[in-house]
UniProtKB/Swiss-Prot annotation:
Part of the ribosomal stalk of the 50S ribosomal subunit. Interacts with L10 and the large rRNA to form the base of the stalk. L10 forms an elongated spine to which L12 dimers bind in a sequential fashion forming a multimeric L10(L12)X complex. The keyword Ribonucleoprotein applies. Belongs to the universal ribosomal protein uL11 family. GO terms for cellular component: cytosolic large ribosomal subunit. Keywords: Methylation, Ribonucleoprotein, Ribosomal protein, RNA-binding, rRNA-binding. Pfam families: Ribosomal_L11, Ribosomal_L11_N. This is Large ribosomal subunit protein uL11. The keyword Cell inner membrane does not apply. InterPro entries: Ribosomal_uL11, Ribosomal_uL11_bac-typ, Ribosomal_uL11_C, Ribosomal_uL11_C_sf, Ribosomal_uL11_CS, Ribosomal_uL11_N, Ribosomal_uL11_N_sf. GO terms for biological process: translation. It comes from the Bacteria. It comes from Mycoplasmoides gallisepticum (strain R(low / passage 15 / clone 2)) (Mycoplasma gallisepticum).
Length: 152
């Protein structure tokens, strides 16, 4: 009788790494995977996103093997790049740090559609606008606050 060892998931980790530049380090060591093999595969799959922040979900198994899923770059990073700023406002209610066009925001919304919980680009655009508002950014021609149907 042949016994086959069943793989068990030991950990699921969510990390943000730089595309094409992952290196073995403490963040990966804690996941418990073959770091050299992971960095080789990750860098190969993200070479077209060189220098961008790439969220990754790593599923580690008891035999040190792994699976990983790449996500799209975080909205905050995309907004900062579009507005050409280093960071958001310390107090976004009173301080505005920049402005981007509706076209740039729509481009971000279309890029992020796969990872957002939105049915269409208009809903995704409102989510992007909400994030921008929390960072102290304005999107020309877009109001992040929409009227709710409740209590109207």
């Amino acid at each position: 009788m042949l016994l086959v060892a069943k793989k068990e998931i030991t950990r699921i980790a969510k990390l943000e790494l730089i595309g094409g530049q992952a290196k073995p380090g403490p963040a990966l060591a804690s996941v418990g995977i073959n770091m050299g093999e992971f960095t080789k595969q990750f860098n190969e799959k993200t070479k077209d996103r060189m220098g961008d922040v790439v969220p990754v979900i790593i599923t580690a198994f008891n035999d040190k093997s792994f699976l990983f899923e790449l996500k799209t770059t975080p909205v905050t990073v995309l907004l900062k790049k579009a507005a050409k700023i280093e960071s958001g406002a310390k107090n976004p209610k009173t301080e505005k740090v920049g402005k981007i066009s509706k076209a740039e925001a729509l481009k971000i919304a279309e890029y992020k559609m796969a990872d957002l919980n939105a049915y269409d680009t208009e809903a995704a655009l409102r989510m992007i606008a909400g994030t921008a508002k929390q960072m102290g950014l304005e999107i020309e021609g877009v109001d992040p606050v929409t009227k709710s149907k409740k209590g109207s």
